[in-house]
Structure formats: structure tokens, C-alpha cells
Amino acid sequence: MNNILVITVNYKNTIITENFIHSLENLDASDKVELIVVDSESTPKTKENLQSLLNSSALKTRLIDSVSNTFYWGGVALALKTLDLNYANGPSWIIACNNDILFSQREFFSKLKELDSTKYHVIAPSILSTKTGENLNPYMAKPINIIGKLYYSIFYLNPSTARLIYNTRKMSQKLFYSVFKKSIPKPGKIYAPQGSFIIFSNNYFLRGGYIDNNFKIFGEEISTAEIALNNNLEIHFLPELAVSHVEHSSMGTNYWSYWFYFSKEAYKYLKKTYL
């Protein structure tokens, strides 16, 4: 087994995964990487396209296909179950990430390999939005407090209320940032990592950590945070490790409804299980 395992999930559009793979291939120490692509709700066409991509890559690769929609975190869980890793003798680092991530830092894996996997159980790197340029990490510095829970109880009343709150918050953030310079986040321990790119050490799993996929989407950040907390594991924000995230440029009505109901479902589960 190579030193670093990368798991990503493809859904329908294989061009996004192709861009992801090409960016990964250009990195130093990519010979120490094994790439697993989960093809969620696989079709003969997506499977053929992805297999062709992986066959032509210099990376060590494997394709895992699923006829059902695994969603993101379910796809990661499926990959780990299929691989049935021996974490004591397997990869030191397991990266779970969206396929709309781009590696722009050539020495990313070289830097990661230098870190102590017994010290850094979960790593949140800099995730730079290609849309805004903002760093999406740290996702949450501290757990949700009483005010936060009240906010979410109002937010999830209905889609219209949620969208009004969302737009108001976005406008206030833009106003705030135009008046006050945003401080550069400092490295250190945090509560929750942003979910589009999370680095787990093998020690996360050896010491009781796991992937909770009892939700469809939007629950990976808090579930990871709470599992780490309950097992005395640490999550570190390390900004010197950086990737780019090609975020959605717009949020139309259909996508908003989709986002609202799935995120509400995830929050309901997280609140019942962890919060």
C-alpha cells in the first residue's frame, strides 16, 4: 500500500473528475499516492469514461462503481469498506475529497509526508474558493452553542425563511469585509474541517474514528468533528497545505430547494446523534 490514499466521488459529469486527476498527476511524490474513484449512480458511459481515464494515468488507481447514488460521504464509506484497510500497516494518510478540487500546490504531498500522523489525527488544509478567493477553512473553530442552535431552528423553518436569512447574512458579510480587513486564519486546533477536502491520518481510525454516513449530504463536517471529540482526537488547521475548490457559481431556485431539504435532514440527524 502506498503512503497516501486519495478517495474522490464522481457523480455523472466525468469531466470534473478528469480535471481533478490531471491536477493530481502533476504533483511531487505522486508516486506515493493511490487514487480511488467511486462512481456514484454509475452508468455504462460514466464507468467507461472513468476507467479510460484511470488506465491512462501514471497513478496507481482503482475504480469502484455503485448503481445507487452513494452521495459524497457514503461514497467515501463505500471505498473504505471495499478496500478493507489494515490501518496499522496501510497508508499513513487517507484523503477524502470532492472531485471539484484542484491541486495547485506542487509540493502538497511532499509537505504532507513530512507530518507526524500520530500527532495530526485530522487535518483541515487551506481550501481556496476559485469563485471568491476566500479560504473555506477553518470551517468551525468551536462547537455550535445555544445561539447557534437557535439560529438553525429558525433557519430551517421553511425554504423562504432560510433563503432570506442566507442572503441577508451574505450581504452583511460583504459589507463587513469591505470595511474591515479580514484577518488571516492562524494554524492550530479547530472544531470542524470544511468537508470538501479532509485529511485523516491512519491513527484517526486506529483510535476509534470512523466515517458516519447516516445522512445523504452536508453532515460530514460536524460528524467528523464530534467523532474526533468523542475519541479524544484532534483536528488541526494547517494553512501551509493548500488546494483550490471550484465552487458553484450560482444557486438557482431548484438547487436551493435541493440544498435546503438535504441540509435540514442532515442537521436533524446530527442534532439527534451528536448535538
Over which residues does each language-model region extend?
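Short, well-formed alpha-helical segments that are part of the catalytic scaffolds
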Residues: 13-27
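A conserved acidic beta->alpha catalytic loop
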Residues: 23, 39-50, 68, 98
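Glycine-rich, basic loop-to-helix element that forms the pyrophosphate-binding segment
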Residues: 66-86
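Short beta-strand-to-loop acidic/aromatic patch adjacent to the donor-nucleotide binding site
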Residues: 90-102
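Conserved donor NDP-sugar-binding/catalytic core segment of glycosyltransferases
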Residues: 102-139
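A recurrent flexible, glycine/aromatic-enriched loop bordering the glycosyltransferase active site
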Residues: 161-170, 178-200
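Active-site-adjacent helix/loop segment of glycosyltransferases
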Residues: 165-170, 222-275
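A short, conserved alpha-helix in the catalytic core of glycosyltransferases
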Residues: 185, 191-210, 214-241
